[in-house]
Amino acid sequence: MPGHELEDVINQRLNLYDVLELPTPLDVHTIYDDLPQIKRKYRTLALKYHPDKHPDNPSIIHKFHLLSTATNILTNADVRPHYDRWLIEFLRKTNDIERNKLIQKLEESESSTIPTTTPHPDLLQIQRHGELLRKLKHFNLPYGDWKHLNTQDQENASQHPYYDCSTLRIVLDNFLQSNNKSNCLSHLRNQVFITLSANEIYDIYFSERNNYSKDDSIIIYTVFDTPITAQHVFRNWSSGNLIPTVKDISPLIPLHYYSDFNLETELNDDIARLVSNEPILLD
């Protein structure tokens, strides 16, 4: 019964989106509501974790049952809203507690005696990030994946003007030395996206959930040179131009985030005249 399943899931503090390897909603506006995709994910993972393939592995059998539970709840229109409300509130409280602990630790570190030697670069990075966290908390803004600081990724993001909207989440078959960045870049350029030029793939980074030695597939976030290139790759995939070694391609920022976007900005009068070729009167 879904009601009993929901109670058990909440008692165990389970994130069913993680179970199905789907994006976790951060608020009511970002709830993942693509039911066909949920069912496709279930079928793919159920084949991978089916007990018949792993009869002597209790953790795999448990994973298989969790997949069924997650699918039952996330595809049930009556039960899912209750679960989503609980999960969003639970994650908010958990993240607030963890973030406050980090902020407190940062404040204690910053208020301590200034050392005579130059601080370690990682400490400087954490201190700068702590300042950002406090600002985001003050203005009640979302703060993303603040637990994992990657200096190189942040530097790359700062150098690319459209880093996030040029990024696609690519699930592809695991391959030899897939955890090596240069090897992975070469694989993407020479084996996967062979119609693209080398400079159209700007950067890549890996999902922290990748298990390179055991999993059949891995997740690579691929940053293209422009949003137009990323859009071209995604549209090709969505229109049925499949790539044999690729299991899924999706935007880093889910499309439904923009489903109700209707912001209109009025042009400055001078710009409007330029667009319409009207003369600009000088004082």
From Swiss-Prot:
Keyword Nucleus in annotation: yes
All copies of domain J, residue ranges: 15-87
Pfam family, one: DnaJ
A biological process term (GO) from this entry: spliceosomal complex disassembly
Xref: InterPro entries: DnaJ_domain (IPR001623), DnaJ_domain_CS (IPR018253), J_dom_sf (IPR036869), Pre-mRNA-splicing_ERAD (IPR052094)
Gene Ontology cellular-component terms listed: cytoplasm; Prp19 complex; spliceosomal complex; U2-type spliceosomal complex
DNA-binding is among the record's keywords: no
Cysteines paired by S-S bonds: none
Principal cellular location given in the protein's record: cytoplasm
Intracellular or extracellular location(s): Cytoplasm; Nucleus
Taxonomy, superkingdom: Eukaryota
Sorted UniProt keywords: Chaperone, Cytoplasm, mRNA processing, mRNA splicing, Nucleus, Spliceosome
Family of this protein: Belongs to the DnaJ family.
Assembly behavior: Belongs to the CWC complex (or CEF1-associated complex), a spliceosome sub-complex reminiscent of a late-stage spliceosome composed of the U2, U5 and U6 snRNAs and at least BUD13, BUD31, BRR2, CDC40, CEF1, CLF1, CUS1, CWC2, CWC15, CWC21, CWC22, CWC23, CWC24, CWC25, CWC27, ECM2, HSH155, IST3, ISY1, LEA1, MSL1, NTC20, PRP8, PRP9, PRP11, PRP19, PRP21, PRP22, PRP45, PRP46, SLU7, SMB1, SMD1, SMD2, SMD3, SMX2, SMX3, SNT309, SNU114, SPP2, SYF1, SYF2, RSE1 and YJU2.
Primary role: Involved in pre-mRNA splicing. May be involved in endoplasmic reticulum-associated protein degradation (ERAD) and required for growth at low and high temperatures.
Protein name, UniProt field: Pre-mRNA-splicing factor CWC23
Species: Saccharomyces cerevisiae (strain ATCC 204508 / S288c)
This protein's encoding gene: CWC23
